[in-house]
Amino acid sequence: MEKAPSLVNLCAVSLRNYILYGDDDNGILQGVYELPTELFDCLLNQLPALALHKLQSQMPIEKQSEFYEYDCSGTGGGRKRVRCGKFDLAWKALYYLRWPENDEYSQEKLLVKKIELENETLCDWQQKYWEMHVQNCFDAAAETAMLPSFSQRIGLIELPGALIKAIGYEQRAKCSNRDYYTLDTHCKEFGYYVRCLRLQNVFFSVETCHLIARSKLKTLILKRMSSQLHVDGVCKILCQHKENIEFLEFANCKISSSFVEAMCQTLTVKGTEMHVIKHFAVKSSKFLEANPASLSPMLLTFISSRFLETLELSDAHIGRNCAKLIFSTLIDASSALSTLDLSDNNISGWLSDFRCEVSNKDSAFRDISKCLQSLRVLNLRGNNLRKSDMDDLRFALAHMPVLEELDLADNPIEDDGVKSLIPYFVETVEHGPLSNLNLKNCELSFDGATGLLDVLVALKYPMTFLSLADNDLGSRIAPALGDFLCTSIRFLDIRDIGLGSTGFLELKIHMPNVVNLTYINISENRGGIQAAEFLEDLISRAQELLVVRAGYNLMPPESLNVICSALDNRKGKLQLIDLMGNHKLCGSKHASILAEIQRNGGPTMLVQSSPSQEAAYDDDP
């Protein structure tokens, strides 16, 4: 027999409906704010987003201070005047209830988790919730607006029922005085909270300016601009928000010189000749230039702004000559960039002129070096760079004293290319060394990788992130990797390097007693039971370990018991073990073990939910 609801729950449901659909002529809401703490908290936890929004927005000012968190740290008995009070905790719960995928474990999110916890007082969960909701509304409306038969106003597009229901609203013709079924209504009601927005080309219009008039956009992402009509609409949107926009991105766009000129004029702040954009990105787009080897002078002026901190031209079809021109412009302008991303552009040879100038003119070289002193991140992924490019790059790197991240993934630099960079590590070990290096899929062999690892170990180089993934290094690399684990390395990606069971056995033998790793990816190495036994040892030695990726390693069924036994004796902070793709492991057969680990505060373990039907992993090329 189903348990009858309590009187408290029945009252909470009644109040929820009143908050959603009532007009409060009788002042009932005032009585809600006077409820005892226990009853108010019970109500708060049962309210959907729209009701919570109404309850919070109508709260009298004199009552607001009563809903902050109390300081339970023991250092003082006072109330903490912080934003993560009872309402914010409720918003946070609603946010992750609706978008659980945003709480997934990933390397990037776990890297910043500690910082986020320390700065949680800066996070406005109500703003995050409605910003994401409005984005969902625009995405849903775009599907309708892109239909050939569409001819009405964008703001009048009716949103899917699932979106309306997600905020707690249900159609009640007789007792509701507001229609939440159109895009226009959601923008008017919640547009105020939007700081970041992604727009498809169907929204590049004057009407969109009316829809987002209340928003104070700091980040604007524009997709699929391809016509003059789109250009005109984009310029109107930019003009409306130019005083607030800091991050501007174009994706899958065709960018003409005339648009660049119009954009620059639109974004210029009154009384100056400059814009205030801090982050400018062009992704998977194309510049429509009469001369493919050139770029619009206005664009070069735009990227030379002293306010610009990040420049990303990823998969923008710029080519070697344009890359040279961009780099030369940044140097001549003494740009204060912290991030330069030229990935996926096929720019082999882009630094050849720079190297020649450096070699021949010492004084010019010293002047040039001043222009690169602020660069912290350099992304050259997927640019078809070769050994000769690494020779040129080494000269440039020598004049980037604060560079922290270098991404060379997906470039066929081979062993000789890595050897060209080794002198750079020797020269920088004592001052401002590189901390993040990505050499994923660089066609390295055992010789090149071992040479690099040996140098880093000998120098005690303070590197925190290294990826050697997708390089055919073989099991012989294991001793060098084991020695490398003695260093300060925190994030190691050695996915699909051909370790095999022999490699994992050697890695286990050479692993130090104390390992500093926070993240490791050993997936796709066909390690079998030896991979599980390596993890058993690693878990006991790496007290700071948060994430382990060990999928597709052909682990036998007994591997899960080996790993779980290590968790019983753990003293660390492990949060995730990913064993997906090991088809002989089955979560349903070990449900009790996995449940016990979770009950004891253990990590999340990702395994196959059911036995695989002979779907063996095949890593043949």
What do the predicted segments below correspond to?
Residues 388, 439, 445-450, 459, ...:
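C-terminal capping region of solenoid repeat domains
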Residues 187, 210-211, 234-238, 270, ...:
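C-terminal per-repeat helix/turn "cap" of leucine-rich repeat
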Residues 251, 255-415, 420-429, 435-436, ...:
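Solenoidal tandem-repeat scaffolds enriched in leucines and small polar residues
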Residues 174-181, 201-207, 226-233, 254-262, ...:
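Short, solvent-exposed loop/turn at the beta-strand->alpha-helix junction
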Residues 197, 220-223, 248-250, 278-282, ...:
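Conserved hydrophobic beta-strand positions in leucine-rich repeat
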Residues 1-208, 215-218, 226:
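Cullin-RING E3 adaptor/co-adaptor recruitment helices
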